[in-house]
C-alpha cells in the first residue's frame, strides 16, 4: 500500500496503565526463547491494548541468553496480569502448548515473543468472537516489518489453504478447540505447526473469522528465523511439505470463513440490543472522553476537516475514540490513529451488532460527548443511543446539502433528530439558512464554523513547482499557456464532462489554454475518453491523485469548480491562500468566500435532480468560459491574487476554526445535555428507526474484498397489527411524518418495509 508507514510499529513506547480486576476474558499465550531484544516492544503492544481484560502467560523455554532472568522478572513486576512460567528446554511448540494449558480464559490469543499487535486488536477480536459464537478463531491482516516490509492481506479459501498457508500464527482461538486437535506440539519442530493446526481444525469443520484491518505485525528478522532455516535445508523442507500434504488430504469438506466487510448472515429486521457488560471503566485517567462517528477515512475536504479538528484537541485533557461506518482502504487510517483509538465497524462486526458495540464503547469509556459527521448510520443510531445516555451531549457537523439525494441528504437527517442534538455545526452560513427555510429546522442551536485552511502551509512563497516530479517534467511545455486547475475527485457531481466542454469553448477562442486535472475517481476513464473525442489531447494533462497539491496551485493561473453540489470546497480555501482566483459554481457557501475581487461566481442552469444528464446547455458553458476569460485576461489579475489571500487571512484560517471548536468542546463536556432528556421512554420507537435503516440499506459490500453478496430481497410480510394503537402515540406520528417529509416512507412502502416494521412494533407493544 503506497501510503502505509511501516515506521509506525505498535509498542514503541508504553502508553496505558489500566490494571482491571476480575477473571481475564482473554489469555495471551507466548513461548519465549532468547528474545530479550524484542520482548519489551511486544509487552508494550500488549499493555497498550484498549481492551485490558487479559492475562499474559509467558513460558520461558529454558533460555540461555544472558539477561533473560532479569528481563522476565521485570515484566512480571510490571503488571500483575503477566505470568512467567519457566521450563526446561523442550522446544517452542511445547512451550506454546503449556502457555495455552495455563490459560484461565476460554479464548486464547497466540502471540510470539518478537511480534507486536495493533492497540485495538484484542478488543476487536473479542467482540468478533462474541458476536460469532460458532466461529473457532479470529484473525486480522498482517504487516511484515523489520527485515522485510510488506502487507499480507489474503482472503481465506479452503482449497488454497491446503496448498499455501493464508493464515497468520497470531489469532484469538477457543482454548478447547486447540486442546481438542492436540495443540501445536502434535507435530515436530520442523513442520509449520500453525498451518498444520489450522488444517486439523478445518478437518473438523471448524472455521475462522477474518477481520479486515492490519492488526498483526510480524517481525521478519534480518538474520532469519525458524522457517527460514527449514527452507534452507532441503530434507527438512521436504519433510515439512509431506506432513502438510498428508494432513490436507484428510479434509473432505469445504469450510467457509466469515470475512469482513459484509452485510449478510444477519436478520435485517433484528432489533438493536446491548451487551451484558459490567466491567470497570477502560480509561482510568481523569480526562474527558470524546466519541467521533465518521463514515470513513478518505482523501477529501470533509475528512481533512475531521483531521484538522482532531489535531486541535488537547490530548492532555481528552481521550479520543473514533468509529467509522463505511468500508474503505487504509489510506488515512494511520494518520487518524495518532489521535486516539480507531474502530472501523465494518472490519470486525455485522451491522446488527454495531449499536451494541457503540453502546459498549460509551459505557466502557464513560463518553462525555458524541460528535457525528457525515455518517448515515450515525444519524440513525443517535436517537437509540440517546435513550440510554440522555445526559450525554450529541452534536453533528454538516458540509453540504444534496437535493438530488434523500431530499437534502445529511442536513435532512440532522433536521429529523434536531430535538436530540445539543448543537449542529455547518460549514457555511448558506447551509444554516437552507436548513431553516427549506427543511423547517429550528436553528437556535446551529452554528456555522468555516473549515479554514492553514495559511502558513498554503503560501506560494514557500512552494516550488519542482516539488512534484510529474509537474516538473511537463511544466516548461505549458509555461506560457493559460493554465486552469481542475482539482477534485473525478465523479459525476463534480461534472467533469462539463469541465471539458468549457475547455473546448475556451480553446475555440484561444488555443493557448490548458487544463491541469489533479485527482481520480469513478469517472476518470470517461473523462479521458471524452477529452480525446473532443480533440483536447494537446490542451489537457491528467496528473492523477496527489498527496501534495500545492505545486499545482502555484503552477496554474485560476481554479475551476463547476460542481452541482458543494458546501464550501477545501480547494477554494487552498487556492485562494495560494493567491489564485477561483471561478466557481454558485453552490453551497462558495459565494461566502468568493466575490468579484478574487474570482467569479457562476449560476448553474442544470438542477441537482438532473445530475446524471450530461447534455449541458450552451448557455451554461458560455457562462463559465466568460468568467474564466475575464480573470485570465484581466488587467487587475495581480490585484485579484492579492485579494484572494487577504480574504483567507480575514477569518477563513484553520486557526480560527480550531479556536471556535476548542471552546465549543470545552463547554459541551463541562455540562450535561440540555435536550432529549425524556428519550428513554421512546426507546422502542428509536429501535424501529434503526430497523428501518437496515431494511432500506441492504446492499452488497465489496464481494471481491471479502464481503458476501446480498440478494436484496425483503422478508415476506406475515401480518399487520395494531396500526390504530401506533397512530395514537404522538411520538410515532411525528416519526412517520418525518419519514414522509424525507421521502423515506415512500421508498419503504414500495418495498413493503413499513408494514413489517409496524408489525414488529405492535408485537413488542403487545
Which residues does each predicted region cover?
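Boundary detector for helix-to-coil junctions that initiate low-complexity/charged tails
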Residues: 1-4, 671-766
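Aromatic "clamp/platform" in nucleotide-sugar-dependent glycosyltransferases that forms part
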Residues: 545, 564
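Short hydrophobic beta-strand element within catalytic cores of glycosyltransferases
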Residues: 581-584, 594, 601
